């Protein structure tokens, strides 16, 4: 391997380390903000305050706070050294981390107030940008930042394709070359596999009655005598055997689908286990894409998803989805279960959406919440 290859590999690893450090510190800062909002009325955490909770619970809260604050402090210096490589979204994440660390400069977060800066932060930010632009290494830092973002995008797309294609390929290949021949071979010897389900039996009986009526109707239209009992019996016997084969095939098809789905699930879990680092990069990539949207675009996407899954016309979509899943798994689509599911699950989803907007989006992007309310009729 040449020197350029070694340098490229080192730069790629360094960029992934920066993304990982920024993601960990950002999640820790969000955890601290969540503790402030939930237990301290959106004020800084104070370890000398009694929260009125059980001692074990209060101890756990403070332990989580200290751990998150240590992560922010430990990673902040290394991230700030590579500030020039960060894009606009990552700089916003870094600003959140810095604001959290500044709030807790004293030991154990005892201070409630911090001394105001002598100059506005926006003016200091302008000076900092000018200094970075005049830095002799500014061009190298910009190129390094571009390479890091490019590597992050490639890693994200690769793990995303693996998470989609590996389960699909495993499902189709295992079903075609392993599961189907195996089930077809052992099904006649195992009563459970060759047993025709009651729903399929009822469908076969209805088809047989319809076939008998078609024979009699065709004889009346052609002006012929009705078939004799023996002829009718022979035709019905052949049709019954055909319907039984179709029912058996449909029954084994459901079993094949279930086994293939299990194989696909195992493949997906293995991809997630062996690609934990890449999944962290993928999360950062999605965060960058989502937070890079304008406020109107964010509000539009939220309204679109809520209307699809919990909106006025969502019951029809849930009905079609549940019936398709039931047919795929070979189980009867019970109307009572579908009605109960539609009456409860969309309500739970709507509650989760509202809680997420109140708890998270309202802090990260208040302007998006305002735009969302305006686009949603003020609700």
UniProtKB/Swiss-Prot annotation:
Q: Which UniProt keywords apply?
A: Cell inner membrane, Cell membrane, Hydrogen ion transport, Ion transport, Membrane, Transmembrane, Transmembrane helix, Transport
Gene Ontology MF: a single term: proton transmembrane transporter activity
The record gives the membrane topology as: Multi-pass membrane protein
Segments traversing the membrane: 153-173, 254-274, 300-320, 337-357
The principal localisation class reads: membrane
One Pfam family, please name it: CemA
Subcellular location(s) of the protein: Cell inner membrane
> According to its record, what are the GO cellular component terms?
plasma membrane
Taking the record's annotation, the residue ranges forming a coiled coil are: none
Q: Does the keyword Membrane apply?
A: yes
- Family of the protein in this entry: Belongs to the CemA family.
What does this protein's UniProt record list under function?
Required for H(+) efflux immediately after light irradiation to form a rapid H(+) concentration gradient across the thylakoid membranes. Together with PxcL, contributes to transient H(+) uptake following dark to light transition.
| Name of the protein in its database record | Proton extrusion protein PxcA
Organism for this UniProt entry: Synechococcus sp. (strain RCC307)
Query: What taxonomic ancestry is recorded?
Result: Bacteria, Bacillati, Cyanobacteriota, Cyanophyceae, Synechococcales
């Amino acid at each position: 391997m040449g020197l350029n290859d070694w340098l490229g590999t080192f730069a790629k690893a360094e960029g992934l380390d920066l993304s990982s450090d920024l993601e960990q510190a950002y999640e820790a800062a969000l955890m601290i903000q969540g503790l402030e909002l939930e237990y301290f009325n959106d004020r800084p955490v104070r370890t000398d305050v009694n929260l009125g909770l059980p001692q074990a619970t209060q101890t756990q809260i403070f332990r989580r706070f200290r751990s998150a604050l240590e992560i922010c402090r430990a990673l902040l210096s290394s991230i700030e050294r590579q500030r020039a490589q960060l894009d606009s979204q990552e700089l916003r994440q870094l600003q959140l981390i810095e604001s959290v660390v500044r709030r807790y400069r004293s030991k154990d977060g005892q201070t409630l107030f911090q001394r105001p800066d002598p100059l506005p932060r926006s003016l200091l930010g302008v000076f900092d940008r000018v200094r970075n632009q005049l830095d002799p290494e500014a061009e190298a830092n910009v190129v390094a930042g571009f390479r890091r973002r490019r590597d992050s995008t490639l890693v994200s797309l690769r793990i995303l394709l693996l998470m989609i294609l590996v389960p699909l390929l495993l499902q189709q290949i295992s079903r075609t070359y392993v599961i189907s021949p195996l089930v077809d071979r052992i099904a006649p010897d195992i009563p459970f596999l060759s047993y025709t389900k009651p729903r399929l039996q009822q469908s076969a009986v209805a088809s047989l009655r319809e076939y008998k009526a078609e024979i009699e109707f065709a004889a009346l239209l052609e002006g012929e005598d009705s078939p004799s009992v023996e002829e009718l019996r022979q035709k019905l016997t052949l049709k019954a055997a055909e319907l039984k084969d179709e029912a058996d095939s449909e029954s084994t098809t459901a079993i094949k689908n279930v086994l293939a789905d299990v194989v696909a699930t195992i493949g997906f879990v293995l991809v997630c286990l062996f690609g934990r680092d890449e999944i962290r990069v993928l999360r950062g990539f999605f965060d960058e894409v989502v937070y890079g949207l304008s406020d109107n675009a964010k509000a539009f996407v939220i309204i679109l998803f809520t209307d699809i899954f919990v909106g006025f016309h969502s019951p029809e979509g849930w009905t079609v989805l549940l019936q398709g899943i039931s047919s795929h798994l070979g189980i009867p689509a019970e109307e009572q279960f579908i009605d109960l599911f539609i009456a409860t699950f969309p309500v739970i989803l709507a509650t989760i959406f509202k809680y997420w907007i109140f708890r998270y989006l309202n802090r990260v992007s208040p302007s998006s919440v305002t735009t969302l309310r305006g686009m949603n009729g003020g609700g």
